[in-house]
């Protein structure tokens, strides 16, 4: 194994991701940020300097478990203090498992501003993947707004709320087109793009040779959009999800929610004199964003040769049965670790939209999360009892709660309590969706857990009840770090609390997290080793450091 050392500077820069100039948060002058590539077992050291003039910054390494380095998870107020302007912070962690991962900002809505990039982990030197391919294409999906994240944050925190609306553009590797379409020739209402190919918004072309197999790695770091990926005339063989191998299956398209990643294999066995569309459309919300497009270019064809037929049609946004059918097909590959048969503790988390003092919030069991100024990891390690609410949040919601009608209760409050687990405890979480403020409306939410992979034991419609127990899959449930709950439905997951630290578990939709849609899990914090001083140089832990510089 080796050490991969990166020196990064984060700063705002002018950029035109969708042919309209805007400001993006870039790294070393790049957008998206540089790709990290390592082998399982390697150490990754990122020397991160904050060149933003007036904002702190952190970077979360999404899907990396951070065993032994919970301070390097990159979640502001949970694992570390934000890095102040002008300061440098050293992230140092091991990448344990091969897979398709990514990194992104985790302070305010900085992910939305463009602070993200890919993190690819190959098998350890000398080991091979369990499937063969001739070449590889890496695709990072995101969504883009013309409105700045500052304006979005202020709007979400205002009364009445000003919602951010749907994104202007879907970006493929940071590239999209807003005022024009590369598929205009099939639709006279669309303005054709006049692109030479060198522009920052020119599509990222997938170049392939005929009669070969390619692995396409697809990760979604969208702020809001649930996406659907398809390639004209080509079947996709799904082989990996969130860095874990799955039982391979063929599909014409995949749904991908924010925080998820997949690998699919394609075989370039179509007519070699043609090129084919790659289309990424929006699902699960009423779309107001054109699909993101690029070409699968069969070499030696010219890139200017457009496919004979229009791009594949994205499935209807509200065809939830189709989404469920795809999601339910994902199971663990043969030989994957199986979940413990019994749980020690089961927590029910009810997802509701509520109004608190006229502000629209998201809440879990009637608590809307507002992070404290002292990072939990330091507060818990050094027993700072005043740093956050010592009363744990509720583990159940009222049995008679009606998930089919808008919430009527006025009990919702802002809070920052923590769910605490014993080391080795087997924890079940039942995520329960419900109606929003508006009649007959429930949304899809992707939930992401830091510091762990979990087994997805099952999904269902309506309210979870004891009868569902027998339907849970203990035989071959997939291991994931992100899982979706469908409208008016529930999702059951199981994980082992075996990674000392404090870990966020939250909706991966950026505005929803901003509005309080998350919880905090802690386990075995007393077993956490030395935490770099700089990670805790704020809030209550800073005072301890000043008073006792040797060891807070």
Swiss-Prot record:
Which cofactor is essential here?
Cu cation
Catalytic activity of the protein: 4 L-ascorbate + O2 = 4 monodehydro-L-ascorbate radical + 2 H2O
Q: According to its UniProt record, where is this protein mainly located?
A: secreted
Binding positions (Cu cation 3): 106, 450, 506
One function term, GO molecular function aspect: copper ion binding
Q: What is its EC number?
A: 1.10.3.3
Query: Which Pfam family, any one, appears in the UniProt record?
Result: Cu-oxidase_2
Coiled coil spans: none
- Cysteines paired by S-S bonds: 19-201, 81-538, 180-193
Q: Where does Cu cation 1 bind?
A: 60, 448
- Family annotation (PROSITE patterns): MULTICOPPER_OXIDASE1, MULTICOPPER_OXIDASE2
Which subcellular locations apply to this protein?
Secreted
Q: Which domain of life is it from?
A: Eukaryota
Q: Print the keywords alphabetically.
A: Copper, Disulfide bond, Glycoprotein, Metal-binding, Oxidoreductase, Repeat, Secreted
- Residues linked to a glycan: 92, 325, 440
Give the cofactor note.
Binds 4 Cu cations per monomer. The Cu cations are bound as 3 distinct Cu centers known as type 1 or blue, type 2 or normal, and type 3 or coupled binuclear.
List of residues binding Cu cation 2: 62, 104, 508
Positions binding Cu cation 4 in this chain are: 445, 507, 512, 517
Annotated Plastocyanin-like domain ranges read 1-122, 134-300, 344-523
Q: Name one GO cellular component term.
A: extracellular region
Family from the record = Belongs to the multicopper oxidase family.
Listed under subunit, the entry gives: Dimer.
Cross-referenced PANTHER family, in alphabetical order?
FI03373P-RELATED, MULTI-COPPER OXIDASE
Q: What does this protein's UniProt record list under function?
A: May be involved in a redox system involving ascorbic acid.
Protein's UniProt name: L-ascorbate oxidase
């Amino acid at each position: 194994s080796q050490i991969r050392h990166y020196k990064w500077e984060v700063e705002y820069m002018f950029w035109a991701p969708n042919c309209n100039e805007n400001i993006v948060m870039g790294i070393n002058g790049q957008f998206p940020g540089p790709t990290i590539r390592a082998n399982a077992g390697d150490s990754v050291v990122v020397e991160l300097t904050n060149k933003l003039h007036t904002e702190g910054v952190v970077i979360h390494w999404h899907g990396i478990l951070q065993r032994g380095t919970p301070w390097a998870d990159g979640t502001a107020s949970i694992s570390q203090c934000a890095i102040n302007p002008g300061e440098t912070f050293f992230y140092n962690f091991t990448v344990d498992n091969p897979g398709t991962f990514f990194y992104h900002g985790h302070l305010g809505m900085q992910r939305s501003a463009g602070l993200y990039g890919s993190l690819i982990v190959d098998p350890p030197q000398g080991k091979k993947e369990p499937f063969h391919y001739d070449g590889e294409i890496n695709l990072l999906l995101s969504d883009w707004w013309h409105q700045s994240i500052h304006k979005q944050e202020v709007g979400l925190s205002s009364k009445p709320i000003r919602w951010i609306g749907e994104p202007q553009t879907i970006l493929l590797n940071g590239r999209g087109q807003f005022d024009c379409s590369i598929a205009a020739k099939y639709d006279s209402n669309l303005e054709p793009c006049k692109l030479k190919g060198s522009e920052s918004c020119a599509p990222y072309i997938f170049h392939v040779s005929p009669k070969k197999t390619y692995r396409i790695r697809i990760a979604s770091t969208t702020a809001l959009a649930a996406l659907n990926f398809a390639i004209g005339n080509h079947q996709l063989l799904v082989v990996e999800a969130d860095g874990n191998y799955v039982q391979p299956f063929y599909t014409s398209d995949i749904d991908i929610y924010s925080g998820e990643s997949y690998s699919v294999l394609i075989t370039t066995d179509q007519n070699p004199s043609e090129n084919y569309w790659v289309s990424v459309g929006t699902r699960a919300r009423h779309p107001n964003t054109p699909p993101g497009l690029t070409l699968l270019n069969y070499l030696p064809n010219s890139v200017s040769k457009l496919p004979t037929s229009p791009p594949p049609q994205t499935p209807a946004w509200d065809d939830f049965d189709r989404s469920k059918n795809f999601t339910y097909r994902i199971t663990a590959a043969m030989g994957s670790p199986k979940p413990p048969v019994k749980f020690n503790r089961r927590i029910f988390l009810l997802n509701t939209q509520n109004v608190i003092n006229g502000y629209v919030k998201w809440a879990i069991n009637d608590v809307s999360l507002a992070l404290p100024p002292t990072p939990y990891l330091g507060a818990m390690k050094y027993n700072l009892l005043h740093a956050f609410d010592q009363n744990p949040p509720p583990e159940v919601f009222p049995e008679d709660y009606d998930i089919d009608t808008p919430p009527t209760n006025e009990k919702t409050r802002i809070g920052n309590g923590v769910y605490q687990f014993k080391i080795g405890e087997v924890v079940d979480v039942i995520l329960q969706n419900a109606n929003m403020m508006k009649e007959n409306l429930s949304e899809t939410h992707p939930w992401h857990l830091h510091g762990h992979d979990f087994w997805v034991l099952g999904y269902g419609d309506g309210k979870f009840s004891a009868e569902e127990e027998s339907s849970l899959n203990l035989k071959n449930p997939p291991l994931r770090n992100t899982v979706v709950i469908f409208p008016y439905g529930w999702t059951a997951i199981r994980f082992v609390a075996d990674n000392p630290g404090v870990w966020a578990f939250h909706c991966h939709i950026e505005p929803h997290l901003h509005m309080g849609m998350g919880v905090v899990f802690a386990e075995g914090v007393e077993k956490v080793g030395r935490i770099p001083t700089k990670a805790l140089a704020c809030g209550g832990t800073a005072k301890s450091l000043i008073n006792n510089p040797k060891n807070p």
